[in-house]
Amino acid sequence: MKASMFLALAGLVLLFVVCYASESEEKEFPRELISKIFAVDDFKGEERECKGFGKSCVPGKNECCSGYACNSRDKWCKVLLGK
């Protein structure tokens, strides 16, 4: 009887600890999200890598990687053939 009471009490304490931990993580989530948004803004000024096969592009801007060309009709990088 004593063992089952102790086990039930330990289970309730464990449940309380898990709920408290998950609730504190939820409170920090908006702060983490905002910091990640501002971290993404820091990278906007940097030069981006070239775009590979199937990535959207703007014709004439030379955004595609070497061996690919921006198709003016489909507006995505395709394999450059013949040139």
UniProtKB/Swiss-Prot annotation:
<comment type="similarity">
    <text>Belongs to the neurotoxin 10 (Hwtx-1) family. 14 (Hntx-1) subfamily.</text>
</comment>
<keyword id="KW-0732">Signal</keyword>
<keyword id="KW-0960">Knottin</keyword>
<keyword id="KW-0528">Neurotoxin</keyword>
<dbReference type="InterPro" id="IPR013140">
    <property type="entry name" value="Huwentoxin_CS1"/>
</dbReference>
<keyword id="KW-0800">Toxin</keyword>
<dbReference type="GO" id="GO:0008200">
    <property type="term" value="F:ion channel inhibitor activity"/>
</dbReference>
<dbReference type="GO" id="GO:0017080">
    <property type="term" value="F:sodium channel regulator activity"/>
</dbReference>
<keyword id="KW-1015">Disulfide bond</keyword>
<dbReference type="GO" id="GO:0090729">
    <property type="term" value="F:toxin activity"/>
</dbReference>
<feature type="disulfide bond">
    <location>
        <begin position="57"/>
        <end position="70"/>
    </location>
</feature>
<feature type="disulfide bond">
    <location>
        <begin position="50"/>
        <end position="65"/>
    </location>
</feature>
<feature type="modified residue" description="Leucine amide">
    <location>
        <position position="81"/>
    </location>
</feature>
<comment type="function">
    <text>Weakly blocks the rat SCN2A/SCN1B (Nav1.2/beta-1) sodium channel (IC(50)=68 uM) and the insect sodium channel para/tipE (IC(50)=4.3 uM), without altering the activation or inactivation kinetics (depressant toxin).</text>
</comment>
<dbReference type="InterPro" id="IPR011696">
    <property type="entry name" value="Huwentoxin-1"/>
</dbReference>
<feature type="signal peptide">
    <location>
        <begin position="1"/>
        <end position="21"/>
    </location>
</feature>
<protein>
    <recommendedName>
        <fullName>Mu-theraphotoxin-Hhn2b 1</fullName>
    </recommendedName>
</protein>
<keyword id="KW-0964">Secreted</keyword>
<feature type="disulfide bond">
    <location>
        <begin position="64"/>
        <end position="77"/>
    </location>
</feature>
<dbReference type="Pfam" id="PF07740">
    <property type="entry name" value="Toxin_12"/>
</dbReference>
<keyword id="KW-0872">Ion channel impairing toxin</keyword>
<comment type="subunit">
    <text>Monomer.</text>
</comment>
<keyword id="KW-0027">Amidation</keyword>
<feature type="propeptide">
    <location>
        <begin position="22"/>
        <end position="48"/>
    </location>
</feature>
<dbReference type="GO" id="GO:0005576">
    <property type="term" value="C:extracellular region"/>
</dbReference>
<keyword id="KW-0738">Voltage-gated sodium channel impairing toxin</keyword>
